[in-house]
Regions:
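Aromatic-lined carbohydrate-binding/catalytic grooves of carbohydrate-active enzymes
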Residues: 1-91, 96-120
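Glycan-recognition surfaces
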Residues: 42-84, 130-200
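Short acidic, glycine/proline-enriched helix-loop-strand junctions
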Residues: 109-142
Length: 200
């Protein structure tokens, strides 16, 4: 059972209670996170996990402007403040007892930029791979499901969503069928395909 976006409005005790309820029902407790995004888009906001840094210090910039996609700013996967956030979030998830995490909006971590904190990184996919290695370091003992993510590199997760949300319009049906056209071969890349949701 996955606790989606909004889980951070709960206290640690409430998160633990959710996990305990799932276990009592014979279910595995899952949670959600977007490690490479800033939804607040507030450059002056301080990063609580690494005092001394503000969000403007970790954004990916292109032509001097923060990279924005789907309503969120992209952050630099190579910045030490992002690793500090990963460590902090991982520790919370582990203390609460979560065994599964859906990592969403992962494409933000693969966006191109003028530069990265780590000067050895020259492309968006290199930055993404660097960030995924860090995620593996902190979340590697959990079941990882990627969403809105590059197909490759694929070795850091057990599953990937073949597409995003689809609703009741014909364009959504077209979108879902298009996703299926490449979804069939992803079973050879990831252990499991995630179709997101199915209308019954």
């Amino acid at each position: 059972t996955g606790l989606d976006s909004g889980w951070n409005s709960f206290s640690e005790e409430e998160l633990k209670a959710f996990v305990d309820k799932c276990k009592a029902n014979g279910q595995v407790a899952g949670v959600y996170w977007t490690p490479f995004t800033d939804w607040a888009k507030n450059p002056e906001r301080e990063i609580k996990e690494m005092p001394g840094y503000k969000y403007k210090d970790v954004y990916l910039y292109a032509n001097g402007k923060p990279q924005e996609l789907d309503g969120a700013y992209a952050v630099d996967p190579t910045h030490p403040a992002i690793e500090a956030m990963m460590k902090h979030t991982s520790e919370l998830f582990h203390r609460a007892g979560f065994e599964y995490v859906k990592m969403d909006f992962m494409t933000h971590g693969a966006m191109e930029a003028d530069k990265w904190y780590n000067p050895e990184i020259q492309t968006g996919i290199q930055g993404y791979n660097y960030g995924m290695q860090l995620l593996d370091k902190y979340f590697g003992d959990m079941y990882i499901n990627l969403s809105i993510s590059p197909v490759f590199p694929a070795q850091y997760a057990q599953s990937r969503r073949i597409a995003c949300d689809a609703w009741n319009k014909i364009k959504d049906t077209e979108y879902t069928l298009n996703a299926l056209s490449y979804g069939w071969w992803q079973k050879y890349i990831y252990q499991f395909n995630d179709a997101d949701h199915i209308v019954l």
